[in-house]
């Protein structure tokens, strides 16, 4: 991709972002499509603050479909800084109780609730509740949290997968890679190729099964 700004002989500025017209080529067979990322841009002659507000208005009024788009966001707390991966449901409930006393409106359970996720070395992509940590099951934890008058949220990283995971062992071809080159890991994880319909279906169904 390419992004840039040019000025012509009449002092007109032109901003552009998209496919690099010099180095990109893609062969399309009859009937095939090439879908590329969408770029959303705004203009302001009144500074960065006005540009930011224009961006917010554009997304809020025309692009966001969520029912939250005109609602104030809840004040929330999550457990990451307090626990990292070292927690169970008792510890989470203790944090939630203290937060509720302070008027916090939502508790978010962060990384470490699934698989054998006791460090960042594995289990991403296997969204199955760790019953040794979440004693009594997720529904019990959610109900306990709701009884304090707080909403409940769960951390997911659906676009990533750990090499040490059942998903990667079953479908190593589902990660983004350049054929013929060794894949790049960051934080012991790969990026899933979400251009593959089967990958998207798996991610959707595995997350939906947790939330149902």
Task: Locate predicted features.
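Active-site-adjacent "subsite" loops/lids of carbohydrate-active enzymes
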Residues: 72-74, 81-85, 158-212
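Catalytic domains of carbohydrate-active enzymes, especially glycoside hydrolases
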Residues: 91-114
